[in-house]
Amino acid sequence: MKLLIFAVIISVVLFPVLVSSRTIKCDQLSGKCINGEEKEIMNMRLGLDVSSRRILQASRYISYEALKKNLPDNRRGEPDQRDNPYRRSCDVHSHCYRFTN
């Protein structure tokens, strides 16, 4: 037992690189872990900032494709009126479309 303790103490003194602590950082989104080099840590932080900005930017506005959809307002019991008489075209949903088959 004493010999084992002596060997550990000598290895720590002679080879501090073997037992030195390293900073290990993990990316929360991808789950990738890196060693503690400063350059890698900075790159990972920048990547997290960019990806979190993309997520926030994607949820802050309504896309133009969603605004282009021309869907009527279906209210039961209301008289049949065109939903938007200036821009809505005549189609099956607004009940003015004629089937010509």
From Swiss-Prot:
- Post-translational modifications: Proteolytically cleaved, probably by S1P, a subtilisin-like serine protease (subtilase).
Query: Which stretches of the sequence are propeptide?
Result: 22-56
* Main location per the UniProt record: secreted
Q: Does the keyword Secreted apply?
A: yes
Site (Required for proteolytic cleavage): residue numbering on this chain: 53-54
Q: Which GO terms describe its molecular function?
A: hormone activity
- Top-level taxon: Eukaryota
- Using the chain's own numbering, where are the disulfide bonds? 90-96
Assigned keywords, A-Z: Disulfide bond, Hormone, Secreted, Signal
Q: Name one GO biological process term.
A: calcium-mediated signaling
Q: Which residues form the signal peptide?
A: 1-21
Please state where this protein is localized.
Answer: Secreted
Q: Name one GO cellular component term.
A: apoplast
One Pfam family assigned to this protein is RALF
Q: Which InterPro entries match?
A: RALF (IPR008801)
- Report the sequence similarity comment from the record: Belongs to the plant rapid alkalinization factor (RALF) family.
Stored PANTHER family: PROTEIN RALF-LIKE 14-RELATED (PTHR33136:SF48), RAPID ALKALINIZATION FACTOR-LIKE (PTHR33136)
Q: What does this protein do?
A: Cell signaling peptide that may regulate plant stress, growth, and development. Mediates a rapid alkalinization of extracellular space by mediating a transient increase in the cytoplasmic Ca(2+) concentration leading to a calcium-dependent signaling events through a cell surface receptor and a concomitant activation of some intracellular mitogen-activated protein kinases.
Q: What is this protein called?
A: Protein RALF-like 14
Query: What organism is this sequence from?
Result: Arabidopsis thaliana (Mouse-ear cress)
